[in-house]
């Protein structure tokens, strides 16, 4: 299990696309630049959607664990 410090945690277990990414976007908006959000998810679509969100919105995907459920993603707010 990866150990990355996070400032906020977002549990999206049980939610299906597009809800997890919508919640990630809302959570990131409320955070300060440089803070890290840990996202916990079980929707297989997040393995594509979270990295895509980071690339499109220009936030840093610091780390991810997608080998087993629940998936975990660490996203650093860049701007």
UniProtKB/Swiss-Prot annotation:
SUPFAM superfamilies: SirA-like
GO biological process, one term: tRNA wobble position uridine thiolation
GO cellular component terms, A-Z: cytoplasm
Superkingdom: Bacteria
Active site per the UniProt annotation: 17
Location of this chain's protein in the cell: Cytoplasm
Tagged with keyword Nucleotide-binding: no
Pfam families: TusA
Role played: Sulfur carrier protein which probably makes part of a sulfur-relay system.
Protein name in UniProt: Sulfur carrier protein TusA
Lineage of origin: Bacteria, Pseudomonadati, Pseudomonadota, Gammaproteobacteria, Alteromonadales
Gene coding for it: tusA
